[in-house]
């Protein structure tokens, strides 16, 4: 867990403790978040590209795994 940001670790702890709701469709949740980052024109292009690349890889892995 230490490789992840403090915010990710905090949300993980909140979900694990039941303080924050768990979303069963984790890939769908991640894709929505990554797509929102990729679409945000106020963010630096490098950040948007990184999010788009991660989302595309999730889409490919989701279809390959089915």
Curated annotation (Swiss-Prot):
InterPro entries: UPF0253. It holds the Pfam family UPF0253. Belongs to the UPF0253 family. NCBIfam families: PRK04964.1. This is UPF0253 protein NT01EI_0864.
